[in-house]
């Protein structure tokens, strides 16, 4: 193959690109030839929308304040804020691998969204770096690994407590100011390990070596992302996380009622006791089945069996009682049992709560949340599955399980970065797409349909002109989203 000559000015620093001609099937009498000499093109035109969301949230600016930069100020070419923007934009756009930035650093559109004034990189100090406006994979990697090390090559030090607090405060800022009831979903999941990472343990339930991260979501908004080793109880650290989360929520929304929702792995006396001691703080937590609980539910199970014999199908009967464990609970608590009998046989389930029977009311006596046992189980507790969908998006779309560094601290940093990128995409959907066809689209679908749009970038003294693909199917939606974000940023 013959190397294609780059004869336009924008190709001055593109001689390292792969420019060998690629031959495809003929199209009638014409040859079909392709190469990578297109110049200043980008496949991520939607990154401009992410830049607006970032500016509206002040996310990268706030996050950069959680790092201490020990580098010489006169030698810095990439500020911490620019490095974070580059990394977060890359994650949100689907470039979770740092090696992707080996070529992405020459993308002028990504450079513009990262805050680079010199989007072409022509003013770089070192001649061999000119044409690369953004940081290299090695520079980004040092920023992530500096969570573990402090030496000559790792001079950007994160303040880990501040990073976690910033994620929490950013998430709480995204909650509606007029909310009367907030539901906090806690859940743990597995993060498989394929090497000899620090904190590597085998987990019997998941049947593999893994980490056991703890997440907390309020609706679609992530509030907490904590990387933990798997040699612990699933609820370990939940009380400490809950105390921080409630404090930040109360500071912004002092009158809101909070419901903690979780599966049976979080039915721990310390968590429930603390909730019971706080004003307007409630819990709705699953209970694992045992012989005592099933014996208490047996009358309802018998009734359900009889009804199924008469009408077939699946029958549910709900029963409430007061229950206390033999050794681990300090007091008896309101317990709701679901006696379900279907084609597969008996399926008893249990939840424990301190939500009163009369429900939750505001100061005027208006009902905010029902207290009926059936409603609490079917309408409120079963919605807990949405948290699993959020974790799935965090894992599959933002690659939060890319915890492949050797050290636990740097893997925690990667988890946080994925959580911040998740927040960018979630806010793009909430602020820019509410009431549209993509208002409930998954983050992966949102990225594919709205952000992956071809763009040609022209740079002059006065402006950066981005020409988006004329055949883009969602042009009206893109423009509508941009207008909404611009209005929100200016308000």
Regions found by a protein language model. Give the residues of each.
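Dynamic "connector" segments at or just before major functional cores
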Residues: 1-208, 212-232, 239-252, 277, ...
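An anionic, glycine-rich sequence signature occurring as long contiguous blocks
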Residues: 2-9, 17-35, 282-396, 482-491
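Short amphipathic alpha-helical "interface-anchor" segments enriched in bulky aromatics
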Residues: 53, 367, 372-413, 417-429
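Acidic/histidine-rich, metal-coordinating catalytic segments
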Residues: 187, 256-267
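Short, glycine-/Ser/Thr-/acidic-enriched flexible segments
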Residues: 189-191, 221, 228-230, 288-290, ...
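A short acidic (Asp/Glu
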Residues: 195, 268-273, 294-298
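Short, surface-exposed basic-aromatic patches at helix termini and helix-loop junctions that form
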Residues: 272-281
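Basic, amphipathic alpha-helical segments enriched in Lys/Arg and hydrophobic/aromatic residues
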Residues: 400-471
């Amino acid at each position: 193959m013959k190397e294609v000559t780059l004869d336009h000015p924008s190709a001055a620093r593109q001689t390292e690109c792969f420019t060998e001609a690629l031959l495809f099937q003929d199209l009638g009498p014409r040859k079909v030839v392709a190469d990578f000499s297109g110049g200043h093109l980008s496949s991520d035109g939607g990154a401009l929308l992410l830049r607006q969301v970032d500016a509206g949230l002040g996310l990268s600016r706030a996050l950069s304040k959680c790092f201490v930069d020990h580098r010489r100020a006169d030698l810095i070419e990439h500020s911490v804020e620019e490095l974070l923007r580059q990394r977060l934009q890359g994650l949100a756009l689907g470039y979770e691998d740092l090696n992707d930035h080996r070529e992405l650093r020459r993308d002028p559109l990504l450079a513009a969204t990262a805050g680079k004034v010199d989007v072409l990189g022509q003013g770089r100090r070192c001649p061999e770096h000119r044409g690369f406006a953004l940081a290299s994979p090695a520079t980004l990697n040092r920023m992530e690994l500096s969570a573990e090390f402090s030496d000559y090559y790792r001079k950007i030090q994160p303040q880990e407590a501040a990073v976690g607090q910033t994620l929490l405060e950013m998430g709480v800022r995204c909650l509606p100011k007029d909310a009367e009831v907030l539901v906090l979903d806690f859940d743990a999941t597995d993060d498989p390990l394929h090497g000899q990472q620090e904190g590597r343990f085998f987990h019997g339930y998941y049947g593999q070596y893994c980490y056991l991260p703890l997440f907390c979501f309020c609706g679609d908004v992530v509030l907490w992302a904590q990387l933990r080793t798997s040699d612990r109880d699933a609820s370990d650290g939940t009380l400490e996380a809950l105390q921080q989360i409630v404090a930040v929520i109360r500071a912004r929304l002092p009158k809101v009622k909070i419901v903690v929702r979780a599966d049976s792995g979080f039915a721990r006396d310390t968590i429930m006791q603390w909730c019971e001691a706080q004003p307007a703080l409630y819990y709705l937590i699953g209970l694992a089945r045992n012989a005592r609980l099933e014996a208490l539910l047996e009358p309802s199970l018998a009734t359900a069996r009889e009804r199924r014999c008469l009408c077939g199908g699946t029958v549910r009967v709900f029963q409430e009682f007061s229950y206390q464990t033999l050794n681990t609970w300090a007091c008896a608590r309101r317990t709701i049992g679901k006696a379900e009998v279907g084609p597969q046989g008996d399926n008893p389930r249990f939840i424990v709560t301190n939500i009163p029977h009369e429900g939750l009311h505001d100061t005027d006596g208006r009902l905010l949340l029902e207290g009926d046992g059936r409603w609490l189980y079917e309408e409120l507790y079963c919605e807990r599955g949405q948290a699993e969908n959020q974790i799935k998006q965090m894992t599959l779309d933002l690659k939060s399980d890319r915890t492949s560094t050797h050290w636990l601290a740097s893997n925690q940093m990667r988890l946080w970065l994925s959580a911040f990128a998740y927040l960018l995409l979630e806010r793009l959907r909430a602020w820019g797409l509410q009431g549209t066809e993509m208002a409930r689209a998954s983050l992966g679908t949102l990225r594919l349909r709205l952000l992956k749009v071809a763009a040609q970038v022209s740079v002059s003294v006065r402006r950066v002109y981005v020409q988006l693909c004329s055949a883009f199917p969602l042009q009206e939606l893109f423009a509508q989203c941009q207008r909404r974000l611009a209005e929100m940023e200016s308000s």
